[in-house]
C-alpha cells in the first residue's frame, strides 16, 4: 500500500477536518501518500482528487465543516458508478480509503472494499446515530451549540413568562434532544422512541406556574427532519391551557462552528486508528469508541444493528423536572 484516499460524505459535522488531518498526517508519518477526494463519492467518480502535503493540514484544526466538501450521491449504489470510481482510484494510484460520514456513506465504503479497495469508515455525523460507538464525530459540538442556544432562549422565556418549544436536530435519533434536555434543565423532552403526553406536560407547566416558575422550556427532537415538530407541539399545548408559547427551531447552526476539544480528540484518535487498520491490510470496518476505547466493527454487523439512545437520560430528565 502506497496511497490512501480520504473523503467526507453526507451531512457535514464539526470535527471532520480533524479526522481528515489525522488520517493524512498518520499516513504521511507512516511513509504513505495521502490524497483528498472532494465532494464525497460524486467527486470520486468525477476524479476531483488532489494530493495532501503536511503543510496543507494544520490550519483546519479550528474550522467547522469539511475542507473536502461533501455531497449526497445516491447514484453510487449502482455498480456503474462504482466502477467509474474505481477507474479514478486506479488513475491516481490510490490503494485504500477512509470515508468519513454516516451510515449511508458506509454502504459506499463497503462497496469499494468488495471491489478490492480496503476502506475504513469513520462516524462523522452530529446525530450520534451510528451503532457500535458511544459518540460520533460532531455530536459533542452540536450538543454544546444546542445547549448554548437553549440557555439564551431561557433568558427571554423567563423575561416574558413564556413557554418555548425548542427544536433540535438529530433526524430520527433522540440523542441531541436527550442530552440537551438534561444539560439545559428542560421541563420536558420529546424525542423518538419515548412516549409523551401533551396534557401531562401542560399540567406540569401549570403546576410549575402555581409554584412560582412562570416560564417553561420543552426540548423537541426534529424526528425524521420534521421542521414543524415544535410548532405542532405548541398548537397542541394551547388546547390544554392559556399558555403564551413560542416555537424555536435551532436548525443548521448545530452543524457548523468551531469543533469542541472532545470532538477534536475523538476525530484524531479515530483517524489515526483507521490508518493503522489499513496498514494491517483490513477493510470493510467501521471505527467507533466504546467505553473510551477506540475499536472497529464489521460494517455488515453495523447495518444489521440499531443505535440505542440512552434511556436513563430520559428518566433523569423526568426525575429532575418534576
Curated annotation (Swiss-Prot):
This is ATP-dependent 6-phosphofructokinase. The active site is at 127 (proton acceptor). Allosterically activated by ADP and other diphosphonucleosides, and allosterically inhibited by phosphoenolpyruvate. Its main location: cytoplasm. Catalyzes the phosphorylation of D-fructose 6-phosphate to fructose 1,6-bisphosphate by ATP, the first committing step of glycolysis. One of its GO terms (biological process) is fructose 6-phosphate metabolic process. Pathway: Carbohydrate degradation; glycolysis; D-glyceraldehyde 3-phosphate and glycerone phosphate from D-glucose: step 3/4. Belongs to the phosphofructokinase type A (PFKA) family. ATP-dependent PFK group I subfamily. Prokaryotic clade 'B1' sub-subfamily. It comes from Pediococcus pentosaceus (strain ATCC 25745 / CCUG 21536 / LMG 10740 / 183-1w). PANTHER family: ATP-DEPENDENT 6-PHOSPHOFRUCTOKINASE (PTHR13697:SF4), PHOSPHOFRUCTOKINASE (PTHR13697). It holds the Pfam family PFK. It is found in: Cytoplasm. One of its GO terms (cellular component) is 6-phosphofructokinase complex. InterPro entries: ATP_PFK (IPR022953), ATP_PFK_prok-type (IPR012003), PFKA_ATP_prok (IPR012828), Phosphofructokinase_CS (IPR015912), Phosphofructokinase_dom (IPR000023), PKF_sf (IPR035966). PROSITE patterns: PHOSPHOFRUCTOKINASE. Mg(2+) binds at residue 103. Homotetramer.
